[in-house]
Amino acid sequence: MIVIPDVILLGASAILGLYLGWAYLRRLPRRPVLVGSHLLLGAAGLEIMVVLLRGTPSGQSLALGVVGALAISLTALALLSGLIAGLIARRSRRTADVTLATHAAVAVAGFGLFVAWAIKA
């Protein structure tokens, strides 16, 4: 049950990301505080995932396996693509659509794999 805080952090980031995506599609004004919170929750979740690579605080080793390694890789790629999306999306609406769709797809895959790994851990 050591992975529960990470599931909560990444789940909150995913829910906030869903809201931000919905607001983007509705062309509502962007709220930098929500975008920053989404970024911080995702980064904190990724940090805990990386810390769990070394084992739990009690010294117990978690079997990472291919699923866990892929979940960490996809979550890191989602964080990177989200940062890139924020930088290059200001050029055109089409560029923003493609980068945000890529970010969302990678993030959903990473979160899904992480939850699958967390259930086994």
Task: Locate predicted features.
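Membrane-embedded alpha-helical bundles that constitute the cytochrome b-like, heme-associated redox core
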Residues: 1-121
